[in-house]
Design a protein with these regions (language model features):
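Non-catalytic accessory regions of SAM-dependent methyltransferases
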Residues: 1-41, 49
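Mobile active-site "lid"/loop adjacent to the S-adenosyl-L-methionine
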Residues: 200-230
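Conserved AdoMet
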Residues: 28-107
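Residue-level signal for inorganic ion chemistry
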Residues: 26, 67, 97, 140, ...
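Conserved Class I SAM-dependent methyltransferase catalytic core
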Residues: 226-287
């Protein structure tokens, strides 16, 4: 039996139910070529698919058709310009989470945060201090550290397996994020932070979409009967670990913004707001720990929260 051409292999993948982009990425990976080199496929669609690339591709097609994420098959996922290594030990970073990163960066640039960060040295640095809870692959923490190298970024996860992935990403990217194992804020270093960010589990136990996520770690996805269990815990404990005027930013489900804003307001946070993702969905919400800011600081923070996509409640 003759080897199929690359074009035939892509048609076979389509018949197996794969989308065109997924099939192209997996074929490039099987051939040992960069996954961004899709133009090469168009120029070589009549080339034969040799062994063992054919066997690798057919295996990946079958696994993708069974629901395994493309990122796990490739071993890599791009997030906020970073090429992160990922596997079944961690949740696949989603583009939606970049809305949380952009909001955090806007707050870190606000003069009010810079002034608070200069009040006292922490970890030998006068830059702002950031804590990422439930870091997983390290996506949020590493994106913030790369974009703001003067910040001191700590990251916590309860999973030793996830932390191994995150640490590997940090070493490979040369980013000095500090990692610690523990249960939310119980695992954080003994410090007060200017900014706490988190993309915690927020899917309800009975959510009908869960079967489609069966290949990803359930502990990173599911949070009780209404999906809010971990969000409640973080909101309740965060004020004790925030400096006066510090911010808490949380990713949540597409229909949870109102509930999360209510949790933040009930805990005494001010400037409570939500920010929309690229699809126009309120994807993350946050608030500011009450403190004694001056008038100009409030105005600076208002600009940071009111910029593109934010809805102030």
């Amino acid at each position: 039996m003759s080897a199929p051409t690359l074009a035939q292999a892509l048609r076979d993948a389509a018949r197996a139910g794969l989308g065109r982009l997924d099939a192209q990425l997996l074929l490039l990976h099987a051939l040992g070529r960069p996954v961004h080199d899709r133009a090469w496929l168009f120029a070589h669609d009549d080339d034969a698919l040799p062994e063992p690339a054919r066997a690798r591709f057919e295996d990946h097609v079958a696994r993708r058709a069974a629901g395994e994420p493309v990122a796990y098959l490739l071993g890599e996922k791009e997030f906020h310009g970073l090429a992160l290594r990922v596997d079944a030990r961690v949740l696949v970073p989603r583009p939606d989470t970049e809305a949380l990163v952009e909001w955090a960066l806007a707050l870190l640039d606000a003069p009010a945060v810079a002034v608070a960060a200069g009040d006292a040295p922490r970890h030998g640095s006068s830059g702002p201090s950031v804590l990422d809870l439930g870091t997983g692959s390290g996506a949020i923490a590493l994106a913030l550290q790369r974009a703001r190298p003067g910040a001191r970024v700590d990251a916590v996860d309860a999973s030793a397996d996830a932390l191994a992935v995150a640490r590997d990403n940090a070493v490979r990217l040369g980013l000095p994020v500090r990692f610690a194992q523990g249960d939310w804020l119980d695992g954080a270093p003994a410090a007060a932070y200017d900014l706490i960010v988190s993309n915690p589990p927020y899917i309800a136990i009975g959510d009908p979409h869960l079967p489609a996520l069966a290949h990803e770690p359930a502990a990173a996805l599911v949070a009780g009967a209404d999906g809010l269990d971990d969000l409640r815990r973080i909101v309740a404990s965060a004020p004790a670990r925030l400096r006066d005027g510090g911010w808490l930013l949380l990713e949540h489900g597409h229909d949870q913004a109102g509930a999360v804003r209510a949790l933040l307001a009930a805990r005494g946070f001010t400037h409570v707001a939500s920010r929309r993702d690229l699809a126009g969905i309120e994807r993350c919400s946050g608030g500011r720990r009450a403190g004694p800011p001056g008038r100009s600081a409030d105005e600076d923070l208002g600009r940071a929260t009111g910029s593109a996509g934010a809805t102030v409640k």
